[in-house]
Amino acid sequence: MGVGMTFEPEVVAQIARQMNEDHADHNVLIVRTLGGQPDATAARMSGLDEEAMEFEATVHDIAVPVRVPFSAPVTDRQQVRAEAVRMVNEAKVALGDTGEV
């Protein structure tokens, strides 16, 4: 799959399931710090493409779509994972936490 193509729906669903079930706290962290929604109380990954990860955040009891861009286009699951880890680490640094994922 090359840049400019979207991921297969099954792949997006698998990645979203893992992010939402295993890393829900990271979703909120990413949305608060990198997604411009510091008041988010919850966030679920809702999709992705080669350019960004998408979330549905809860802000003041309202569902808000949030798109957080990758540092570079991604073309496979390993790159998505690396970008998710980068996002979490960058978000932690923004909050003064230097511990890496």
Regions found by a protein language model. Give the residues of each.
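Binding-site signature for planar aromatic cofactors or substrates
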Residues: 1-101
